[in-house]
């Protein structure tokens, strides 16, 4: 439906949803390019997973994903930025939430996609090198530590909640992807 809204219906575009974790990782490893050009993004776990697999990754140069992606992968310039509560993205608007939407520069996106296609070998080699850095810096334990630090930082700013989370209060499991319970 979203693709129809932007006249992007094409038999070559495959939408996969609710695949098994095993198939999902297989697609990330065997795909030629990972594309995540969202208007708004949090941590963007699929992007960091694609990057850790050594897949050339194109992404919007905005939001929380810059925590790990900045200086890596293939960023797409942002054309404009506006408050999320402007409510002009139709039913996909989360206007009650704070934050901004970022409009990717779609001309730049097409240039980047063409460049990756033409120079695929170079981008693949670069992505494989970057994947080593990503896996060393952002394994599950390190990401859980980042999350714990963020939670404790948040709690320390709220006097009525001023009680740091202790390690024995956290349960981390990886059965079907990461799951953190506090």
Regions inferred by a protein language model and the residue ranges of each:
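Nucleotide-activated donor-binding/catalytic signature segment of Leloir-type glycosyltransferases, i.e.
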Residues: 1-25
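Short alpha-helical donor nucleotide-sugar binding micro-motif in glycosyltransferases
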Residues: 26-31
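Aromatic "clamp/platform" in nucleotide-sugar-dependent glycosyltransferases that forms part
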Residues: 39
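A short, glycine- and acidic-residue-rich donor-binding loop in the catalytic cores
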Residues: 44-49, 57, 64, 68
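A charged, aromatic-enriched C-terminal amphipathic alpha-helix characteristic of glycosyltransferases
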Residues: 100-111, 118-149
């Amino acid at each position: 439906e979203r693709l129809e809204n932007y006249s992007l219906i094409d038999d070559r575009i495959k939408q996969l949803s609710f695949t098994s974790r095993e198939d999902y990782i297989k697609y990330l490893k065997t795909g030629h390019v990972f594309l995540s050009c969202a208007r708004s993004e949090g941590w963007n776990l699929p992007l960091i997973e694609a990057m850790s697999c050594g897949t050339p990754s194109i992404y919007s140069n905005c939001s929380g994903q810059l925590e790990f992606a900045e200086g890596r992968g293939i960023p797409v310039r942002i054309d404009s930025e506006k408050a999320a509560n402007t409510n002009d993205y139709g039913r996909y608007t989360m206007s009650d939430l704070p934050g901004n939407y970022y409009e990717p520069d779609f001309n730049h996106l097409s240039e980047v996609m063409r460049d990756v296609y033409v120079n695929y070998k170079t981008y693949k080699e670069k992505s494989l090198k970057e994947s080593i850095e990503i896996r060393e810096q952002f394994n599950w334990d390190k990401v859980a530590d980042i999350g714990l630090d963020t939670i404790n930082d948040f709690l320390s700013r709220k006097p009525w909640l001023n009680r740091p989370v202790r390690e024995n209060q956290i349960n981390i499991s990886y059965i079907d992807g990461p799951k953190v319970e506090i």
